[in-house]
Structures are given as structure tokens and as C-alpha cells.
């Protein structure tokens, strides 16, 4: 039997790396989805950000209310200068108190009009398996 070393090594590496990737899975997936959503907000695409948010956020705020609040918040802070991950934590309870997977992500951020801020993004796993933003705030 002939064993092709590059193929065998590739399979072995995949088997060793896959559990490590899966171990951080929910938090990493939630963070990626949250950063995509934050990019929409940074680009001023507030209505689209609302459309791509979790049902919980949409239940709490109409699209018009979300757009108005987000514009006001961004006017107060100015444009994003930098953002660095501070923490991300997986919990088993959604912001509404209902059971469900939730990841709370915090960033140390700098804005044009605010030299130091903590952004908190609350991600929930929705029934379709996607991670979506259920809430976001800047302190």
C-alpha cells in the first residue's frame, strides 16, 4: 500500500486542528457575525443593520426607531478610529431571560469624539442557527 505523505500529513493536521477550532466555535462565529453587523453600522447602513438583527431586537425597536437611535449615537461618538476585542463570553441565557445561547462581546474602542469607550454587542443564536445581534451599546 502506498501512502502519500503530503496527503497523510494534511489529514492528520486537519484531525488535530478541527477540535481546537470547534472548541472556540460559538464565540468565534458570533464574533464574526457581530463584526459584520458593526461594519454595516459604521458604513451608515442602519436600516440594513436592523434587517439583519435578531428577532429580539426587531421586537423591541421598529426600524425607524433603531435608525434614529443609531444615528444619534454615532453623531455623539463620531466615526470609529479603532476597535480591539476585550472579551467574549458564551452564556446559556438570552438577554430576554429565555434559555438560549448568547455571546456577549466587548471591545475597547476609540471614536473621533470619544477617546475611550467600551462597545458591548449581544449576539443570540436564532432558530435557523445563525448568530445575530440582539443589542449593542457604547459606554
Q: Over which residues does each language-model region extend?
A:
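Short, low-complexity N-terminal intrinsically disordered segments enriched in polar/charged residues
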Residues: 2-3, 12, 17-45
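Second-shell loop/turn segments in exported
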Residues: 23-24, 35-38, 53-58, 108-110
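Short solvent-exposed beta->alpha transition segments
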Residues: 31-32, 47-100
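Structural motif
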Residues: 41, 75, 126-128
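Exposed beta-sheet edge and beta->alpha loop/turn motif
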Residues: 88-139
